[in-house]
Amino acid sequence: MFIALVPTTGWWDQHVWRQKEVHSFLATDERIVRPAADGGEVAVINLAGELFMNTGMSPFRIVDRLVDEAEALADAIVVDLHAEATSEKVAMGHYLDGRVTAVLGTHTHVQTSDARVLPGGTAYMTDVGMTGPLESVIGVRTDIIVKRFLTELPAQFEVADGPVRLDAALITAEGGRATGIEAFKVLL
């Protein structure tokens, strides 16, 4: 059994990648998971969904090649599918069942209650959730988001203050196949 802490950052045009002040850190720190990155004994494949994401490419078209490459490098393969559509995440879980250790959805910031091991031995969860302010609208100050909905005008997002919650999934595996998955959250 092994333990891997795998923080991911989302797709290129969102979240951390828009923050110019961290670009030099992102360019030099090898611990940061980037799209289609892998490392060590645990390979992490970071894919962006196509539906409602404007990526211009289906993750289904590239994932087979990436899984084949990762199998040669790692004992376990975790797929992070950063996607909006639940259907796309569920389909990817079934498509990769038995070929990867886990398929974990990200992007919607709300932890789902469907963590399970699929029949072929792949741990699956539609969305792991977020690490961010508890009293917020998916991490952003609530007043900004409410005003945006009321006025229908763009607004500069600001991270909310206050207690932080960490959403995560604990996966146990043997021989590259999941034996369990447990969703959890911690208030920090």
Predicted regions: what they are:
Residues 1-188:
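Acidic, metal/ion-coordinating pockets
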